[in-house]
């Protein structure tokens, strides 16, 4: 969802209710898309707050994907959610059907301004405006051997966030991703 605060547009992803009705709605929408695009994937979200158990989400995703759909596993989204909701991302990955993963996304983010929340709490943001953090690189190396159907890796960076001279750092991240992927094969 998106809202405005003090003239700023703020986007905070809010998770779907993990109910059978939500599974049915998402599966129907994926089926509609699949009538146009032969291979449809669902990306895990970077949810900043959760009212339920965040480790229930992998089972919810597995039910949505079943045998027909695929997963775009965004490791920075997972890292963001794990930091903000306080859980072990490895426990999340252990529950997720990684045979459904066709793409892995890598990105970076930043920490929010403490003034955003009355509690002064900071959040990790999935802003795609920084280098891939070390925990995400470690997740990549950990998860690759368990993704037998992986077809692509995507390094994401928001347009306008690469300063002059930073292209070298971006290229190094791309080389690092390639090395990790090649080592896992």
Where are these regions (language model features)?
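A structural motif corresponding to the C-terminal end of an alpha-helix
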Residues: 28-40, 67-69, 139-152, 180-184
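Distinct, well-ordered alpha-helical segments
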Residues: 50-66, 81-94, 167
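Gly/Pro-rich active-site loop or hairpin
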Residues: 13, 17-20, 81-149
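C-terminal helical cap(s) of enzyme catalytic domains, especially alpha/beta-barrels
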Residues: 163-185
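Active-site acidic/histidine proton-transfer and metal-coordination neighborhood
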Residues: 1-70
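Generic structural signal for well-ordered alpha-helices
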Residues: 26-34, 58-62, 93, 137-144, ...
